[in-house]
């Protein structure tokens, strides 16, 4: 088993560059299935386990995929298979994003029910509601969801009960090849939605209104391969903003888009963090003393749920009582118990977490419960006394490229080790003293 070992006490300083956005690239790779003519070439693609997984899904569906030098080339011009099996989908719930493109291209899709981070039920009912509105019949059973349409999908007016990012992306992709116009209301407004729409339009789609609550998609007969560069990862940028603030450091985060970080910036400035927009990105300077604040996660442009656990680590160092309320996902507080292992004064009350600070955290062996919790525990380790050992790094690898190396380059005392290697080293040390 691999683990990351971090020793607290260092101020982080320097420059770090964020990768392309994980939450943008996965639905974009899935949407590449819509192009029945030509190749799609995607640049600024992060080297993440989730990207390898979605690439394998596409290969299983009979697309040709080449991933090298942060570029993915996809040729989906051959006849596609209709089924994405459990062996792939169980690893990552974003695999369900191939359903809309398959339904639009083939008139049928059969997808194993998704996996991914264990943060609540995260149902796909809004995806299926959209497909049904466009004329598809949907069946769920035996661990699969199957959708099929006789003839072709038809444009429809669809209202989402909640501005689900995944549902917005899946329905938007499916609607590009539907007959007629689809109007999607109460749509998600995240920057990743806009990036997907830009990619679809580059392929020849007619998508308007992405980034607003109402998206209009006029169906076309065919989509073609295109070139597209993935937007920077705002969650990775936010994570390094916290790294600067929590250590009282000074970090320039390159390839960050300030407009995508407004809600994070606002809360951190409330806490006393200095944030400067520069041509290269965002510079973050941590204060000597952090102020307590309250945060409520909301759909974009509200505070992102994917930054909740990292901000929790930061608020543990703030002076006073802070509260975080999670409104987007249920069961996203599993990392609270791990913070307690580090001597944090923190408790759960319903859908909120209350923290009293500042905390004198102590290094401990902790387990990452999901992707963002993994980063949060490492951030907490940066300011803990002694050594913090973080396990279950498979979660971290789903969303961060060389996270420990980037932190080390900023001055952190951190390394990633194989448990067996560590045991051998410890044995060698004990042998020397025998």
From Swiss-Prot:
Keywords: Cell cycle, Cell division, Cell shape, Cell wall biogenesis/degradation, Cytoplasm, Peptidoglycan synthesis, Pyruvate, Transferase
Superkingdom classification of source: Bacteria
GO biological-process terms attached to the record: cell division; cell wall organization; peptidoglycan biosynthetic process; regulation of cell shape; UDP-N-acetylgalactosamine biosynthetic process
Residues forming the catalytic site: 117 (proton donor)
EC number: 2.5.1.7
CDD domains found in the cross-reference section: UdpNAET
Positions carrying 2-(S-cysteinyl)pyruvic acid O-phosphothioketal: 117
One Pfam family it belongs to: EPSP_synthase
InterPro entries membership: Enolpyruvate_Tfrase_dom (IPR001986), Enolpyruvate_Tfrase_sf (IPR036968), MurA_subfamily (IPR050068), RNA3'P_cycl/enolpyr_Trfase_a/b (IPR013792), UDP_GlcNAc_COvinyl_MurA (IPR005750)
GO cellular component: cytoplasm
Ligand binding (phosphoenolpyruvate): 22-23
Pathway(s) where this gene product acts: Cell wall biogenesis; peptidoglycan biosynthesis
Catalytic activity from the UniProt record: phosphoenolpyruvate + UDP-N-acetyl-alpha-D-glucosamine = UDP-N-acetyl-3-O-(1-carboxyvinyl)-alpha-D-glucosamine + phosphate
Residues annotated for UDP-N-acetyl-alpha-D-glucosamine binding in this entry: 93, 122-126, 306, 328
Subcellular location: Cytoplasm
Family, as annotated: Belongs to the EPSP synthase family. MurA subfamily.
Main function: Cell wall formation. Adds enolpyruvyl to UDP-N-acetylglucosamine.
Name this protein carries in UniProt: UDP-N-acetylglucosamine 1-carboxyvinyltransferase 1
Classification lineage: Bacteria, Bacillati, Bacillota, Bacilli, Bacillales
Gene name of the record: murA1
